[in-house]
């Protein structure tokens, strides 16, 4: 009798277990996908000035909500992973010409040149000089998507191919790209200035490329001639301060570090003969490179210490990171500068964001833009599941560049009017 009374309770118990399991799974999904996070306009850090007021009026994306895809877009990890594996959705194939420049040390630098597909909104000749992220080049999907959009908005685009990054271009000297070497980017900019003497420049850098372009502009005042503005997206500002955070498991940074190190090893070893071959006349600093340590490296810091710093003869990793980071050059940039990071970027620790925040509080030419979501170079947009081909980042950079071009045009017209009035008096 007791058994007969107890059996009906068993299904209820099992249903309770199932319900608890489903609830646990849903909780994990909500937490992992960050579904409870709100959508909001980006946080903006700037000084009140005529320029900042004009930008807020002319760039709607600065004050509108950035709305990522509903299901997964609020996860910085998924945004970053999709950028890393997929690049972009339905990426176009812009047509350009590859240019070759022989550097003073025998290295062969390359960049791709893309002509505008429409007239610019202010009618001027404007060239975007673009520096991609680590080990990237003009054939990467996120670069192709951005270039195509910029072309359609009237920009000529010059995209640097990092030294050693293109698989079909051999190194012609025992040197490849490093974290902050500006030689190749500077050579590309000088080529553009010489070939198109009437053009004005918009400087754009993504991730590591953001460090390079900011360092380039701050190295000497002459590098800012003909430059209308600069945009840096998702850089970390200081390799020295970032190295400790990049070894932490928080936000899986140690795992990302391992993946990036593995990719760098493959690139370096693909050029082992040009870099380390017995027939190569290489600098003394490379002579003692222990390739066995490169094979076993599991972090970018180990690779930088064993190989990368030696390309430029740095005596220590600390010296390499101090000299190659743009942080010590940012205060020397006088052209309008927009720094963009995502709050959920798993590669850039929040402590590093104090650098652009502090700079924007001191300099009227600097605006720091910090959306809640976007990951590392993701910034996908879309309604529910599938992302759009064009990202929020692509649109923001072009919108900002257009606004700066208009700002400069207005200043020029005001100056001309004042000159006419002075002549009449």
UniProtKB/Swiss-Prot annotation:
Acylglycerol lipase activity is activated upon binding to progesterone. Signal peptide: none annotated. It is a single-pass type II membrane protein. Glycans are attached at residues 136, 410. The active site is at 207 (nucleophile), 345 (charge relay system), 376 (charge relay system). Keywords: Cell membrane, Glycoprotein, Hydrolase, Lipid degradation, Lipid metabolism, Membrane, Serine esterase, Signal-anchor, Transmembrane, Transmembrane helix. Residues 128-382 form the AB hydrolase-1 domain. The chain crosses the membrane at residues 10-30. InterPro entries: AB_hydrolase_1 (IPR000073), AB_hydrolase_4_CS (IPR000952), AB_hydrolase_4_sf (IPR050960), AB_hydrolase_fold (IPR029058), ABHD4 (IPR012020). It catalyses: Hydrolyzes glycerol monoesters of long-chain fatty acids; an acetyl ester + H2O = an aliphatic alcohol + acetate + H(+); a triacylglycerol + H2O = a diacylglycerol + a fatty acid + H(+); 2-(5Z,8Z,11Z,14Z-eicosatetraenoyl)-glycerol + H2O = glycerol + (5Z,8Z,11Z,14Z)-eicosatetraenoate + H(+). GO terms for biological process: acrosome reaction; acylglycerol catabolic process; medium-chain fatty acid biosynthetic process; medium-chain fatty acid catabolic process; negative regulation of smooth muscle cell migration; response to progesterone; response to wounding; smooth muscle cell migration. Residues 31-425 are extracellular. GO terms for cellular component: acrosomal vesicle; sperm flagellum; sperm plasma membrane. Residues 1-9 are cytoplasmic. It is an enzyme of class 3 (hydrolase). Its EC number is 3.1.1.23, 3.1.1.6, 3.1.1.79. Pfam families: Abhydrolase_1. It is found in: Cell membrane. GO terms for molecular function: acetylesterase activity; diacylglycerol lipase activity; hormone binding; monoacylglycerol lipase activity; nuclear steroid receptor activity; triacylglycerol lipase activity. PANTHER family: ABHYDROLASE DOMAIN-CONTAINING PROTEIN (PTHR10794), MONOACYLGLYCEROL LIPASE ABHD2 (PTHR10794:SF45). Belongs to the AB hydrolase superfamily. AB hydrolase 4 family. Progesterone-dependent acylglycerol lipase that catalyzes hydrolysis of endocannabinoid arachidonoylglycerol (AG) from cell membrane. Acts as a progesterone receptor: progesterone-binding activates the acylglycerol lipase activity, mediating degradation of 1-arachidonoylglycerol (1AG) and 2-arachidonoylglycerol (2AG) to glycerol and arachidonic acid (AA). Also displays an ester hydrolase activity against acetyl ester, butanoate ester and hexadecanoate ester. This is Monoacylglycerol lipase ABHD2. It comes from Macaca fascicularis. The lineage of its organism: Eukaryota, Metazoa, Chordata, Craniata, Vertebrata. The gene is ABHD2.
């Amino acid at each position: 009798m007791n058994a007969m009374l107890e059996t009906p309770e068993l299904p209820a118990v099992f249903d309770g277990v199932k319900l608890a399991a489903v609830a646990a799974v849903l909780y994990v999904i909500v937490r992992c996908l960050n579904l409870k996070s709100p959508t909001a306009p980006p946080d903006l850090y700037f000084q009140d000035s005529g320029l900042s007021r004009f930008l807020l009026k002319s760039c709607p994306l600065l004050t509108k909500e950035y709305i990522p895809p509903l299901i997964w877009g609020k996860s910085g990890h998924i945004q970053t992973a999709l950028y890393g594996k997929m690049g972009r959705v339905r990426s176009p194939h812009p047509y350009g010409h590859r240019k070759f420049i022989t550097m003073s040390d025998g290295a062969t630098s390359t960049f791709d040149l893309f002509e505008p597909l429409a007239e610019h909104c202010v009618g001027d000749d404007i060239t975007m000089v673009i520096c991609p992220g680590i080990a990237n080049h003009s054939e990467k999907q996120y670069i192709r998507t951005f270039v195509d959009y910029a072309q359609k908005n009237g920009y000529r685009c010059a995209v640097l191919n990092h030294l050693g990054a293109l698989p079909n271009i051999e190194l012609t000297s025992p040197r490849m790209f490093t974290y902050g070497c500006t030689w190749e980017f500077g050579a590309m900019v000088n080529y553009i200035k010489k070939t198109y003497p009437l053009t004005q420049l918009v400087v754009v850098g993504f991730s590591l490329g953001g460090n390079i372009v900011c360092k380039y502009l701050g190295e000497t005042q002459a590098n800012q001639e003909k430059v209308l503005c600069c945009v840096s997206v998702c850089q970390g500002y200081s390799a020295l301060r970032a190295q400790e955070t990049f070894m932490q498991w928080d936000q899986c940074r140690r795992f990302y570090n391992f993946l990036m190190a593995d990719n760098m090893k493959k690139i370096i070893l693909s050029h082992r003969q040009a870099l380390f071959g017995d027939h190569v006349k290489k600098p003394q600093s490379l002579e003692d490179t222990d390739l066995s340590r490169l094979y076993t490296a599991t972090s970018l810091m180990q690779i930088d210490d064993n190989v990368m710093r030696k390309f430029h003869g740095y005596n220590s990793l600390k010296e390499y990171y101090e000299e190659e980071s743009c942080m010590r050059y940012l205060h020397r940039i006088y052209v309008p500068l927009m720094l963009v990071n995502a709050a959920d970027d798993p590669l850039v620790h929040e402590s590093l964001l104090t650098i652009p925040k502090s700079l924007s509080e001191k300099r009227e030419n600097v605006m720091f833009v910090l959306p809640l979501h976007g990951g590392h170079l993701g910034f996908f947009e879309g309604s529910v599941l599938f992302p759009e081909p064009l990202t929020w980042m692509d649109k923001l950079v072009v919108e900002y560049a257009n606004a700066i071009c208009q700002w400069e045009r207005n200043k020029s017209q005001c100056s001309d009017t004042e000159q006419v009035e002075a002549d009449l008096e």
